[in-house]
Amino acid sequence: MKNTQENNATKAERILRAAYSAWNNSAELRRVRNRNKNFTYGRQWNDLTTDIDGNPITEGQKIRETGKEPLTNNMMRQMVKSVVGRFRSNIKEELHDKNLSAIIKFNQTDELDSRALEEFLISGCCVQRVDYDILANNALRIDNVNINRFFVNAIQDPRAWDCEIIGQLHDLSLAELIMKVGARHNRNRASWIREIYCNENTEKDIVNFSTRLGANNESAFDFWYTHNNKFRAIEVWTIESQEVLKCHDRKTAKYFTIPFTSKSTIDRENSLRQKKNEPEISTQWDITEVWRCRWFSPMGHLLAEYDSPYRHGTHPFVMKFYPLTDGEVHSFVEDVIDQQKYVNRLITLIDHIMGASAKGVLLFPETGLPEGFTWNDIKRIWSATNGIIPYSPNHSGDIPKQISTNATDIGAYEMLQIQMKLFEEISGVNSALQGKLTSAAIGSETFQRQIDNATIALGDIYETFNTFRSDRNQKLMSIISLP
């Protein structure tokens, strides 16, 4: 019995180690996503570079050190809003099942899917969770999952059929945690959970356990620790081989499958039937794959474990990664980051040149200063409306002259126009898709054709996301359909 407990503990730790490894392997994905998010929402001068001494510094700080103010013309945000807006204007949910329609409406999936598409454009990933909400009378609930709280093994299949381990990090109150792990009706288990989370050694236990599993960086901190006053729980789903018994009850003409560990129950039932001379239950040993869920504390405690309770027999997540060429994830917005940076540099340069150029400088010959006037008088009268300055030409013929220079005529505007045009070409989001008329003379048919052409350029993005929504609805149907 002791060896069995040790084996179970070793297996649980091995699974948690695999989950942590999957989390670490996604560190680059989270880093790139955070950079893409910063650019999309206007924080576009945070990329690191070096100063003249080789010290790391942000591009914005470096620009300020040269006396210029870094400016941002956020074209990426408008691009993303246009793509999401086009999606929302074309949403069509043709659902023939009344129960599914009610769930879709209750969960406000139009809003959820729009935000999921925005995440998909920014990070190349979108994840939703379809599950029963035990905090709301087991109502069927759909939620978007934050990529920063999600982990999965390295997958190559765009359908994610090669998923082997998947999970989510949760920050919960103590009451929520007790209900999530199925201890709400078990006072002893609830007290045990309260004890392991609320004692003076909790922080020390987290450090010791996470260090044993190799945690030694900031990414590790995000996995094991919360950023608020709640309690961290780690939900891990794995696909495992399991011994089963395929059973045929010849008395009731039913066919069912049970875990091999329940063989003694069948044996007892068959013994009773032999005495009554009734048909027995015939069995056949077999191996099958099952999805199993485990909940862990950050101190390594196994809080709960169970086989998938859903009719579809898998985990509750629906995910899509794009495009998964050689397993790589590349988002829609990352293609235009270089153009966005160049546009920002150009408008910063133009602003600096305009600020430093001569604007209305007055050249007034010293010998032409009228008698009784000071230079302050000349300055005041020159800037006043209808001002008059008496002036007597001298022998040199010099007259006052005001100078205004067009110092921006250095090709900067032309370069800016080129970059903005390239931005449209690379992204596929043209002016028509943004609702802008390129010419007043353009006809409605031509304008619609431009929109259709732009939509074709984005067709792969839209179709991939619609496949994700279809997978989500199929998972919903498999839960609510009768067995």
PLM-predicted stretches and their roles:
Residues E69-K98, Q128, Y132, F151-A154, ...:
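Long amphipathic alpha-helical segments
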Residues M1-W291, W295-P298, A358, G411, ...:
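Extended, helix-rich architectural segments
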Residues V336:
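His/Asp/Glu-rich acidic catalytic environments and adjacent acidic regulatory segments
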Residues V361-L362:
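Juxtamembrane/interface segments at transmembrane-helix termini
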Residues Q340:
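Conserved short S/T/G-enriched processing/targeting/catalytic segments and their helical context
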